[in-house]
Amino acid sequence: MKKGTVINTQLSQVIADMGHFDLLGIGDAGMPVPEDTWKIDLAVSKNLPSFIDVLKNVLSELQVQKVYLAEEIKTENPEQLKQIQQLIDVPIAFIPHDQMKQDLSKTKAFVRTGEMTPYSNILLESGVVF
């Protein structure tokens, strides 16, 4: 049995496959995912698992150099933004939500959580450990 934090097979696989500058999306249950994007669906029920819990676990195993958030999170979900900022110690770029939806087609995968709060979506840009 895997000893690390992330034990979901698909999520572990995509994290291991990430290269420098690759993107991984994590988001709420309502985020529309392009048909050609690999969707790792972790949602069980409303807010289970939460966006923050999944983000914490992914950050424990993935080297991240930059993140992208929807500009709208600043006004529509400031509490979630505050929690994200407490976890992230890399540059944050704010982009329009519509741009984030388009950028999902550039990700290695999108991780769907059970989160039911608006604009709880993030794109993680992979860094290197050296």
Curated annotation (Swiss-Prot):
This is D-ribose pyranase. One of its GO terms (cellular component) is cytosol. It holds the Pfam family RbsD_FucU. It is an enzyme of class 5 (isomerase). One of its GO terms (molecular function) is D-ribose pyranase activity. Catalyzes the interconversion of beta-pyran and beta-furan forms of D-ribose. Homodecamer. Pathway: Carbohydrate metabolism; D-ribose degradation; D-ribose 5-phosphate from beta-D-ribopyranose: step 1/2. SUPFAM superfamilies: RbsD-like. The lineage of its organism: Bacteria, Bacillati, Bacillota, Bacilli, Lactobacillales. It is found in: Cytoplasm. Keywords: Carbohydrate metabolism, Cytoplasm, Isomerase. It catalyses: beta-D-ribopyranose = beta-D-ribofuranose. Its EC number is 5.4.99.62. One of its GO terms (biological process) is D-ribose catabolic process. Substrate binds at D28, H97, Y119, S120, N121.
